[in-house]
């Protein structure tokens, strides 16, 4: 939003952190070959589902490279050995050769094929926007093998949510997201890419022309509105008046900044819960599947009922890191990695798209511009980079009379705009 608005207007950015970028957070790891940049938040995108991000990268001349998006699950069984498989062909599925004789695994595979084939028709059923995913799967006759060993772990890995919350996920949102992202296709899945040198490279290009107008370490304490403008009080004690304010933060943080929020702002911005996730950048292989042949880009490490979601991202594979040191980003491990393996600990908050949140989400745009205040963030869509970008660009265009320097099909298809067609992705 600030990038596009500043092409015509005088824009000041208040950033709470000491670096710009938010979840575009590249950490430099010391490796035998030298310093290696590793992403820990935003990591990958694809051109099919991220049209504006793709266009932005091309406009800024950001160099990208192919990535790998394989998925594996390592599940607690109550026995000494875990149940493990990956989607990387037969050798991944049967990496543990005992899986060949596992009736549960064969049933899971058969039901994956059945669900993927039925998904387009299932998404047309009425009432699925209010039906929890767990209830939907049971009503459709899918077994615990499909639910507990594949779908729920994959959803938990994508949205960084515990299994209990994934089961309450609206079934329609799940079906549309998986279908639109090619996750229910047995072939023809989108090709994923990553920013060469880490996402810091695009953040640098996005901000380099605005030096002096980005105030780092200047979190906003309070925003107050009146008939003539907006008063912004920051954490450093500064107080300034502006014509308009764009609050580009999580919805709960946005609400916390408003010192004079009205009832509608409190209802809509307060409707979306957030999940705190602890991420560790480290080199401890104990947080990967036991079977080395199972190792994939995304590795769901199941710890049983009631455990927080634990996912390990194999960064060497995701970003083709130029090092022999194996580096991982693990969310919510049951214990901390060994200290000599730790590079960095980071805290991230992710939106939880429960039914109440989705109802509020469809009404969010009605508060745009009220009392000179605008909002944008990934919570307007699916919680991903493209969603935040679409919201920010749409706000800039509506507020500032500016236009993004590219044309893409269905440019705001992931967010709910007044008078727009049904969103391309609900979540």
Question: Predicted segment positions?
Answer:
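Helical element adjacent to the flavin cofactor pocket in flavoenzyme catalytic cores
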Residues: 174-235, 240-243
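Glycine-rich FAD pyrophosphate-binding loop
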Residues: 6-30
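Mid-domain catalytic core of redox enzymes
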Residues: 218-350
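Conserved flavin/dinucleotide-binding core of flavoenzymes
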Residues: 28, 86-89, 294, 307-427
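N-terminal glycine-rich dinucleotide-binding loop that anchors FAD/FMN and/or NAD(P) in oxidoreductases
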Residues: 27-53
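Mobile amphipathic helical/loop "lid" adjacent to a hydrophobic cofactor/ligand pocket
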Residues: 47-171, 175-176
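Hydrophobic anchor at the start of a short beta-strand
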Residues: 9-12, 64, 245
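Glycine-centered tight beta-turn/hairpin loop motif at sheet-sheet or coil-to-beta transitions
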Residues: 33, 78-80, 235-237
